[in-house]
Amino acid sequence: MDIYKKLKVKTYINAWDAVSAYGSSRMEEETLLAMREAATRFVHIEELQKAVGREIAKMTDNEAAYVVAGTAAGMLMASAVCMVRHPEPELFAMLPDASELRNEFILLRERKTSVGYAIKAAGGKVIDVAFGQHVTLEDVERAITPKTCAIVYCDTQVLSMRCPPLRALTLLAHKHDLFMAYRSEPEPVSY
């Protein structure tokens, strides 16, 4: 049975990229087998998340990793962590009311994406700096306030030509005790 025919959903050939809104990407057979095996038993999800995070962090040579259900979910989680800064449950419980926290995100992006909405959903305030224009490191630094918690760089080919290099932005973030978030974005579709 074809589930998409049953639901009357049109299928297509994805010749663009692994984009969440277009079904992301197809799963490898190994992944499908692991999911089938995992579905036969019950586990404590928090324990599973921690174990999988450790494994992915090792595989990707990172200090930590966390599995989410797409870009927007990942940015929402990252935004919450950037605002709270410390693993204190009572601070997370305040969200999405982040008015007492450092809750401003300097967002360098070329166009509207799910990233800005995810930041707002977590309780953050978006400060657009490079929306469709050239921007210098000084422009970004001028946008930093005592309420700023992170610089978020949504990389596209066009934006990378209009903004300071990622390394310079990261050093600026560290200089001001800010988190630096990087989101690699596919280029927009033209029809």
Regions found by a protein language model. Name each.
Residues 14-51:
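A glycine-/small-polar-enriched, mobile loop at the entrance of the PLP active site in fold-type I
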Residues 1-22, 26, 53-67, 72-191:
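Conserved PLP-enzyme active-site core in the AAT-like
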